[in-house]
Regions:
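Domain-level signal for Mg2+-assisted phosphodiester chemistry and nucleotide/NA-binding surfaces
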Residues: 1-89, 110, 118
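Short, ordered loop/turn segments at secondary-structure junctions
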Residues: 14, 68-69, 101, 124-125, ...
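Residues at the N-termini of beta-strands
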Residues: 37-39, 95, 137
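A polyampholytic, Gly/Pro-enriched intrinsically disordered region
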Residues: 62, 86-92, 141-149, 158
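Acidic beta-strand-to-loop metal/phosphate-binding motif
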Residues: 41, 94-101, 108, 112, ...
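Intrinsically disordered, low-complexity glycine/proline-rich and charged
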Residues: 110-153
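Short, well-ordered alpha-helical microsegments
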Residues: 22, 49, 105-106, 127-129
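N-terminal regulatory modules in eukaryotic regulatory proteins
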Residues: 154-193
Length: 193
């Protein structure tokens, strides 16, 4: 399977990402494969979510309504996690793109990887390292939006966890190897050379 044939589920936490990044998120996913699922989770009755409408229509993203049941509790995260597990067990994708700037999806990223899924994480610079290192690759939205054509700096060296990749702190743990892909179509890591 070629890399561009890989099917992805793109799941976005609207509470922790700005709508200005949607184009860049989808461009990055299209470099990896096809966005089979495009879902975004939030309480769409909240006036602060009004700015999302134009982007959702433009990019055909399915908004998933999740009311805030209790003040201070985030039911959006639970809905996104349940959907991710349903998609995982459907067998319809080879990878997930989890977009959030908080650590609530760390365990989900770990679980998806354990099931053999490629996990691409995206978030703002404030994203905690626990979520970053749980993903196979993590891209910082501020960086990819600054220079869409040059994505190499956006693949962050997840240096907080060098042992996972068998590299030292100074090496980039995840990078593309031209002409050397795994059999599943995803780029090799240093460990897989």
């Amino acid at each position: 399977m070629e890399q561009k044939d890989s099917r992805f589920a793109v799941l976005i936490d609207a509470d922790n990402v700005s709508p200005k990044y949607i184009k860049y998120i989808l461009d990055e996913v299209s470099d990896q494969g096809v966005a089979t699922y495009k879902r975004i989770y939030g309480d769409w009755t909240d006036i602060s979510k009004k700015s999302w409408k134009e982007q959702l229509l433009r990019y055909s993203i399915n908004p998933i309504q999740q009311y805030s049941n209790t003040n201070g509790k985030n039911s959006t995260d639970s809905a996104m996690i349940i959907d991710a597990m349903d998609i995982l067990y459907s067998g319809n994708v080879e990878g997930f793109c989890l977009v959030s700037s908080d650590s609530d999806f760390t365990k989900l990223a770990q679980r998806l990887r354990e099931s053999g899924m490629f996990v691409l994480g995206m978030g703002e610079q404030k994203t905690p390292s626990s979520f970053r290192v749980a993903c196979d690759a993590f891209k910082i939205l501020e960086i990819i939006s600054q220079n869409e054509d040059d994505i190499s700096p956006a693949i962050t060296a997840v240096s907080e966890n060098p042992a996972r990749y068998g590299t030292s702190q100074d090496e980039t743990p995840f990078h593309y190897k031209q002409g050397r892909n795994r059999t599943d179509g995803f780029p090799c890591t240093d460990r897989e050379q």
